[in-house]
Amino acid sequence: MKVRASVKKICRNCKIVKRSGVVRVICIEPKHKQRQG
């Protein structure tokens, strides 16, 4: 899980999701998981 100021899609499998006010990227590739913070 990477914590970043700006979350971006890295590949076409990445999806941007907002969960309880936190922007996250979920992907089948574990390295692509990100959270805004």
Swiss-Prot record:
InterPro entries: Ribosomal_bL36 (IPR000473), Ribosomal_bL36_sp (IPR035977)
Superkingdom to which the source organism belongs: Bacteria
SS bond partners: none
A cellular-component GO term for this protein: cytoplasm
Keyword entries, A-Z: Ribonucleoprotein, Ribosomal protein
PROSITE patterns for the chain: RIBOSOMAL_L36
GO-annotated biological processes: translation
A GO molecular function held by the record: structural constituent of ribosome
Family under the similarity heading: Belongs to the bacterial ribosomal protein bL36 family.
UniProt xrefs under PANTHER family: 50S RIBOSOMAL PROTEIN L36, CHLOROPLASTIC, LARGE RIBOSOMAL SUBUNIT PROTEIN BL36C
Protein name: Large ribosomal subunit protein bL36
Organism in which the protein naturally occurs: Shewanella frigidimarina (strain NCIMB 400)
Name of the encoding gene: rpmJ
